[in-house]
A protein has these predicted regions:
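Low-complexity, Ser/Thr/Pro/Gly-rich disordered linker/stalk regions
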Residues: 1-88, 92-95, 104-114, 174-177, ...
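Flexible glycan-contacting loops in extracellular carbohydrate-active proteins
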Residues: 181-210
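Glycine-aromatic-enriched beta-strand/loop faces of beta-sandwich-type recognition domains
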Residues: 97-147, 201-204
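Loop/turn elements at helix/coil->beta-strand transitions in domains of secreted/extracellular proteins
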Residues: 36-38, 156-159, 193-194
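Surface-exposed loop/edge segments in extracytoplasmic proteins
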Residues: 132-136, 170-180
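Extracellular/lumenal carbohydrate-interaction signature centered on repeated Trp-anchored short motifs
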Residues: 61-71, 139-147, 154, 189
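Short loop/turn segments immediately following beta-strands, especially the blade-tip
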Residues: 114, 167-170
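Localized edge beta-strand/strand-to-loop motifs within extracellular or lumenal beta-rich domains
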Residues: 144-168
Length: 234
């Protein structure tokens, strides 16, 4: 497994091979850090040993697990112009000891999920243990004039707040999307620390309809625990 250092943290890049979501072909060479310390994620069209073309995706995860706090991703790229089959995920995802797939997950995603038109982004919270609840996600439309955006997850024991803002910033100015999920049931909010992940992939493994490769740059990731710390549910 390939590892790299980005924004002061060690990240493991998913090993090359086939698997979900998708399924897709994952390529550990599709993540790199440039001299300015920015992370590059690529979706590439590759000719394999048999002479056939195939699409390669990328995913990476922090070696550390993070708890309640403020998660911020500063992105460079036209996330509003993705092909309908392209997905960018900025998210928290459980390790097997925390819970199975479909639990303990918080997502910011930019995708149309194969649709030619309609919303192109969503925020989602998967429960700790209960079945998914109505209102645990929201879709919205991103329309940019430039390529710089900031996206945040504010995770507390009783609620999750997500924000998206124009530009790279640490304040709340130029916010274009805000969502707060406070279900009133502790089972509907993740409670345990998990790694942070980012991935760039293809919905159902379907190649981009426009045939174009994609590169997204993450200029910075930051985490700040809440002060004072937010207590978990008993």
């Amino acid at each position: 497994m390939t590892s790299l250092k980005f924004s002061g943290y060690d990240w493991d890049v998913r090993a090359s091979g086939v698997g979900g979501p998708g399924p897709n072909i994952w390529d550990e060479t599709n993540a790199s850090v440039d001299r300015a310390g920015r992370l590059h994620l690529q979706l590439t069209n590759v000719t394999n040993a048999a002479g056939d073309t195939e699409w390669h995706c990328v995913e990476l995860a922090t070696q550390l697990r993070f708890g309640f706090g403020r998660y911020q991703f500063q992105v460079i790229g036209r996330i509003d112009q993705f092909d309908p089959n392209v997905v960018l995920g900025l998210f928290k995802y459980p390790t097997p000891d925390v819970g199975p797939d479909g639990t303990n997950e918080i997502d910011i995603e930019f995708a149309r999920w194969g649709r030619a038109t309609g919303n192109n982004a969503d925020y989602v919270v998967f429960p700790q243990s209960a079945p998914r609840a109505q209102g645990d996600n929201v879709e919205f439309m991103v329309a940019l004039k430039g390529s710089y955006t900031t996206h945040r997850i504010l995770w507390q024991s009783t609620q999750v707040t997500c924000q998206s803002l124009y530009g790279h910033r640490d304040d709340d100015n130029n916010q274009f999307e805000f969502w707060q999920y406070a279900p009133g049931d502790p089972r509907l909010i993740p409670q345990l620390p998990t790694p942070v992940r980012m991935n760039l992939w293809l919905f159902r493994g379907t190649p981009p309809s426009n045939g174009e490769e994609v590169e997204i740059v993450i200029s910075q990731f930051s985490f700040a625990p809440f002060d004072p710390p937010v207590d978990s549910y008993a």
